[in-house]
Amino acid sequence: MASDLKSKFLHVYQTLKSELLNDPAFEFHHDSRQWIDKMLDYNVPGGKLNRGLSVVDSYQLLKGAELTDDEIFLASALGWCIEWLQAYFLVLDDIMDGSHTRRGQPCWFRLPKVGMIAANDGLILRNHVPRILKKHFRGKPYYVDLVDLFNEVEFQTASGQMIDLITTLVGEKDLSKYSLSIHRRIVQYKTAYYSFYLPVACALLMFGEDLDNHVEVKNVLVEMGTYFQVQDDYLDCFGAPEVIGKIGTDIEDFSSWLVVKALELANEEQKKVLHENYGKKDPSSVAKVKELYNTLNLQGVFEDYESTSYKKLITSIEGHPSKAVQAVLKSFLGKIYKRQK
C-alpha cells in the first residue's frame, strides 16, 4: 500500500508540474519552460517526501476508510504544496549558508549556469504554491483557511531562519549568545511549524475541521518537531555517516542542541575548551569537542531526553478526545521515535 501510495503521489507531481508549465498567467517560450521544468525536477521531488506523504496518511487516518481517487489527488496536491515550500526554503537557505551539497548533489545555485538566478527560482517556487491552491481548492469552503495557513507558516519559518542567522552570524562564533531557550525558538519556528504542524493542519482543513479547535494538536506537533531536531543534532554528531547518509558538520557549524547542553553542563575549564574549538573546521578542534561531549556523557543525556520527551508526547496525545486525531499523532511519533537516520 505504501509504495502504491508513493507512486500515486509522484504521479500527482507530474500533473501539477505540467499545469504550472502551461499556466495561462504567463506566456512561456521554449527556454523559460525548459528552465522551470529542470529547476522543479532538481529541487522539488528529490527528498524523502515525508512532509508531503504525511498529508495523505493523516487524511486517511482522520477519514478511517479508503480514500477516493479525488481525495488522494487533493491530499497529494496539498502534500506537494509543502514540498514546494520546502524546496523554496532550501534553495534560498543554501545560498545564505554558502552550502555545497544538498541531498547528495550540488546545491542548485552551485550549478554553472544557475548561480544567483537561484534567488529568483526560489521566488518562483514560493509563488507556485498559491497557483496550485487556486487551481484545485478555490471552490472549497476551506480555501481561505488554506491560503492563510500557508502564509502564516511561511512567515513563521522565515522568522525562525532570521533568529538563526542573526544568532550565528558568520565569523562571529560567539557561544555566549546561545542558550536552550534560543535553540528551542529557532527550532520551533524554523522547522517544527512547516515540517510537523503544516501537514496535519492541511489534512484537518481538508477533513472539514476548524484549526482554532485544534490548538492542542498544534502544541503536540511543535513539541514533536523540537524532539525531531534534537535527534537530528545528536545523529549529526553520533550517528554513523553510512546510516544517516551525510557527513555531520554540526561541530563545525553552529546551532546544535549538543553544544547548548554542553555549555549547560561544563565547568569553566571545559567551557574554555568549547570556546576555543567549537565552530572550527580543523580535525583536531572537532576531535577535542567530540571528546568533551563524551566526557560530559551527552549520549546518556540525549537518551534521558529522548525517553522523557516520548513519555510526555504520549501522555499529551492520549489526552486528546478524538481517537482519529490520536492515530494521526501516534503515526507521526512512530516514524521518528528512536530513528537512526
Swiss-Prot record:
Cellular component per GO? cytoplasm
Q: Which domain of life is it from?
A: Eukaryota
Binding of isopentenyl diphosphate occurs at: K48, R51, Q86, R103
Question: What family does this chain come from, according to its entry?
Answer: Belongs to the FPP/GGPP synthase family.
Binding-site residues for Mg(2+) 2, renumbered to this chain: D93, D97
Protein name, UniProt field = Farnesyl pyrophosphate synthase
Q: Where does dimethylallyl diphosphate bind?
A: R102, K190, T191, Q229, K246
Task: Write down the EC number.
Answer: 2.5.1.10, 2.5.1.1
Describe its function.
Catalyzes the sequential condensation of isopentenyl pyrophosphate with the allylic pyrophosphates, dimethylallyl pyrophosphate, and then with the resultant geranylpyrophosphate to the ultimate product farnesyl pyrophosphate.
Q: Which co-factors does it depend on? A: Mg(2+)
What SUPFAM superfamilies does the record point to? Terpenoid synthases
The entry's free-text remark on the cofactor is:
Binds 2 Mg(2+) ions per subunit.
Involved pathway(s)? Isoprenoid biosynthesis; farnesyl diphosphate biosynthesis; farnesyl diphosphate from geranyl diphosphate and isopentenyl diphosphate: step 1/1; Isoprenoid biosynthesis; geranyl diphosphate biosynthesis; geranyl diphosphate from dimethylallyl diphosphate and isopentenyl diphosphate: step 1/1
